[in-house]
Every structure is written in structure tokens, then in C-alpha cells.
UniProtKB/Swiss-Prot annotation:
Protein's UniProt keywords contain Nucleotide-binding: yes
Native source species: Bacillus cereus (strain ATCC 14579 / DSM 31 / CCUG 7414 / JCM 2152 / NBRC 15305 / NCIMB 9373 / NCTC 2599 / NRRL B-3711)
This protein's GO CC annotations: cytoplasm
Pathways per UniProt: Amino-acid biosynthesis; L-arginine biosynthesis; N(2)-acetyl-L-ornithine from L-glutamate: step 2/4
Purpose of the protein: Catalyzes the ATP-dependent phosphorylation of N-acetyl-L-glutamate.
Family statement: Belongs to the acetylglutamate kinase family. ArgB subfamily.
PANTHER family, per database record: N-ACETYLGLUTAMATE SYNTHASE, N-ACETYLGLUTAMATE SYNTHASE, MITOCHONDRIAL
Protein name: Acetylglutamate kinase
MF annotations from Gene Ontology: acetylglutamate kinase activity; ATP binding
Record bears the keyword Amino-acid biosynthesis: yes
InterPro entries for this protein: AceGlu_kinase-like_sf, AcgluKinase_fam, ArgB, Asp/Glu/Uridylate_kinase
Record keywords: Amino-acid biosynthesis, Arginine biosynthesis, ATP-binding, Cytoplasm, Kinase, Nucleotide-binding, Transferase
Length: 255
């Protein structure tokens, strides 16, 4: 068991996770060293509404002034993270929840002043993750990062891709509520960058699948070798540890 695998679970999926999901994580842990990264968008939006703070986004990123950052940190590092940790442990999967600010795990580069405390991963302190895994814990990471003495919000896709690239992970798995990319009703088991562009142009990929594949493409650019888009409400792992869904790779360069 030498290869790492990073599992990214968006905030909209956290309340849909069932026993099947946790059994899949058990199967993955038998073959790989597992790291989980989670989001928390719906919970953050709800808490901001409770606090009478407007929810604003630009180009898919949450505009995060200081008062929003305080709420983001509270939700991601608090209730959301610990709920997932407790669900894992309920299924006999030992987990440790932490955020990217713990041990300077996720160091970031700010995106722009206009959107506030939002950053993209620039460095990952992998020794912390490896230490937890060597003690047989599953690290459960909230996507908060640091720059100097300031805490920043990180898009969970970017956080997961940064961690996967830094660990040299075998695979980054995006947990969704669909089986993968479908073409004429059939699952596309393997695809690459150029074919995805064609799928979008021809309308094979539409709606909510577009941001999922865009996240996969962005992960490839960050150095991740293989991304799988799977349905977290079903059994998405073979006994071999391979994922059932759509696998995205860079493809072959003819340059």
C-alpha cells in the first residue's frame, strides 16, 4: 500500500453520503493511503443567511471579505469537518479532521484583492498528511489555507488537486451524485482533455457536469495524473481498488 488517493467530497454531497460510500472508502483504504478533502458551500450559505450577510460569487469563487471569512472558517473547520469525521468513525474508519491552516498544511497565493480572502494552493506541507496516514488515520481536510498570518478560503476542488499533486497521488476522485459522463445514455469510462472539449462543444456534457469536468481539467494542469468522477451514492469501487465512473487523463501529446 504505497500509492496515495485523494477523495474530494463537495458540500452538496455531504448530506447524501450513505453506508455504501463509507464501505467504498474502506475498500480504497485496503489498497491505498487515503486523504479526504471536503467542501461546505450549502452550509456556509445557510449560516451567512442566518447572519444577514449577502452571498456573492464571481467566476465560481465566493467573494470573501473578513466577516464572510469568519463564517467560512467556523463552518468548514467546525461542524462540517467534524460531522464527516464522526461519520467515518461511526463506520470504523479512524479519521483526524484538520484544516489547511493547521501546521501550515495548505499555503496559498491570494487570487485578487477584489474577491477578498480567497486563495489558491501554492505549497502543501505533506509531512503532516504522511504522518497521520502512517499512524493509520484518514486525514479529513477543510479547505482553509494560510498566507503569512492570514487565513484564506480555498475552493475545495483546488485544495484537493493541490494535495493530490503534492503527494504524487495515483488518483483524485471527485464524489458526485451522477455515475460520470454519459454519452447517448452510456457511461464514458475513459476520456481526456481534447475529447472533453469536443463533448462540451457538441452538447454531450451540459449543465451541472460542466463544472465537474472543468475541475478535473484544472486538476490535470496542476499535475494530477488521473481523475475519476464517480457516483458517491452507489458502490464506486472494484475489489481491485479501481474506481467505477469516468476516468479523465491528459491524453497523448503529438507535439
Amino acid at each position: 500500500m504505497s500509492d496515495y488517493i485523494v477523495v474530494k467530497c463537495g458540500g452538496s454531497m455531504l448530506n447524501q453520503l450513505n453506508d455504501v460510500f463509507f464501505e467504498c472508502i474502506k475498500k480504497l483504504q485496503q489498497k491505498y493511503k487515503v486523504v479526504i478533502v471536503h467542501g461546505g458551500g450549502p452550509e456556509i450559505d445557510a449560516k451567512l443567511k442566518d447572519c444577514n450577510i449577502n452571498v456573492e460569487k464571481r467566476d465560481g469563487l465566493r467573494i470573501t471579505p473578513k466577516e464572510v471569512m469568519d463564517v467560512v472558517q467556523m463552518v468548514l473547520c467546525g461542524s462540517t469537518n467534524k460531522k464527516l469525521v464522526m461519520n467515518l468513525q461511526k463506520h470504523n474508519l479512524l479519521a483526524v479532521g484538520c484544516s489547511g491552516c493547521d501546521g501550515n498544511l495548505l499555503q496559498i497565493q491570494p487570487v485578487s484583492e477584489e474577491i477578498g480572502y480567497v486563495g489558491e494552493v501554492s505549497y502543501v506541507e505533506t509531512a503532516l498528511l504522511k504522518g497521520l496516514i502512517n499512524m493509520e488515520y484518514i486525514p479529513v481536510i477543510a479547505p482553509i489555507g494560510v498566507n503569512g498570518n492570514e487565513i484564506y478560503n480555498i475552493n475545495a476542488d483546488n485544495a484537493a488537486a493541490g494535495i493530490a499533486a503534492a503527494l504524487g497521488a495515483k488518483e483524485l476522485v471527485f464524489i458526485t451524485d451522477v455515475d460520470g459522463i454519459l454519452h447517448e445514455g452510456n457511461l464514458v469510462k475513459e476520456t481526456d482533455e481534447s475529447e472533453i472539449a469536443t463533448f462540451i462543444e457538441t452538447g454531450v456534457i451540459t449543465g451541472g457536469m460542466i463544472p465537474k469536468v472543468q475541475a478535473a481539467l484544472a486538476s490535470l494542469k496542476m499535475g494530477v495524473q488521473k481523475i475519476s468522477i464517480v457516483n458517491g451514492t452507489k458502490d464506486f469501487t472494484e475489489v481491485t481498488g479501481e474506481c467505477i465512473g469516468t476516468t479523465v487523463t491528459k491524453g497523448v501529446s503529438i507535439a
